[in-house]
């Protein structure tokens, strides 16, 4: 029977939502296997990382390398590895596929990762944000990494603009007094900007 706080029911609903998420991601994974295999243009470090983390066995790793030595195209070898990942699919498979090392080595994976993120967002929004399940937290970490990279780019652009502005201001302060004096005194003599005149005279001291 359900407890007074309704927690058994909530737990069941959360499990159903997580299962639905995994099913959606698995379906998308099957559709994108060919695209993923085309994006991974070399076996290293992809196959090695799968072997090291026991996503594939040592024997299968050697079989895949033997296929490469027999001049089987790399994309077909990678496709075989993806078929193995499909058999044991969960969210950790996606996190391993789209980890930082693979993103740097195989930049074509970036667009594919975004397609998975877009597919996952509706289901993630319905989940309890305090969920401690490994698959959910790993996926959220993956999404946070992408957002952090965007923030770093924005910060870099802002810093560059600040440096340019400082350089322009510093160069402006090199104006000579003979250029400064006629302008300021001209304003004063014509009763223009009279309130600004004392301040401008003070700024004169800043000039070389």
Swiss-Prot record:
PANTHER family: NUCLEAR BODY PROTEIN SP140 (PTHR46386), NUCLEAR BODY PROTEIN SP140-LIKE PROTEIN (PTHR46386:SF1). Pfam families: HSR. GO terms for cellular component: nucleus. Residues 6-121 form the HSR domain. The lineage of its organism: Eukaryota, Metazoa, Chordata, Craniata, Vertebrata. InterPro entries: HSR_dom, Sp110/Sp140/Sp140L-like. This is Component of Sp100-rs. The gene is Csprs.
